[in-house]
């Protein structure tokens, strides 16, 4: 029965989809506290399942933290180790030294610590002002970020980035943008659109250093009688582009060595009159 329960826990973890922003773990890098935007324990699901059984069943869980577990890690020298595990029970935060939870981590005990020797690849740590956020997974960025590369738990590379806002302004989720697009769309002259619903799909936005839109890709999709049709080279494409170009400046960010445009892909409905 216990094996079956462990298997169920592993399966639930495997099919979990991050449909909301996820709570970060914590990592100490040479004494400094950072958010760890990832969950190294997800790569050892048998360990994670046993850990779940070893912790209080009444711990608080949420869509942002379905397991109700926050792990505290550190890099000692060049080696990643798991120091402790924290949970919330009622109004109390309980922290358990990882070494005291011997059963889940028996394969990774190295003298006086838990060696995260299963960790391979890249982890991202962050702190400071949040510059960008999407309500899914760890799709967010901060003023300071570090990319750590590991091989069998040993750090082989570390890259540090200082991020900032390049231009402040609009993005496609802004209500004023939505209103400007609706105001700029006169559909009365397009008889082929009557009785249908129409969507404009915007992507590939090209914005210059001043925050002005140079170009973008617009697709017009008409749905009528249960069928969807892309209207190639429809005049509405140009109208949407012009409406967007009349808005300035657009918000752009300098993130981890690249210029990005927040929410640069978006679909919005066009009201058909």
Question: Where are each of the predicted segments found?
Answer:
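Acidic, low-complexity proline/glycine/alanine-rich linker and hinge segments
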Residues: 154-194, 231-248
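Start-of-domain marker
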Residues: 18-83, 87
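Short, positively biased Gly/Pro-containing turn/loop motifs at secondary-structure boundaries
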Residues: 229-273
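An exposed acidic His-Trp-rich patch
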Residues: 83-141, 180-184
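Short tight loops/turns at secondary-structure junctions
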Residues: 196-226
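Bacterial Sec-dependent N-terminal signal peptides
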Residues: 1-23
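Acidic, small-residue rich beta-repeat scaffolds with periodic aromatic anchors
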Residues: 125-163, 203-207, 212-214
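Short loop/turn motifs at secondary-structure junctions and domain boundaries
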Residues: 64-65, 192-199
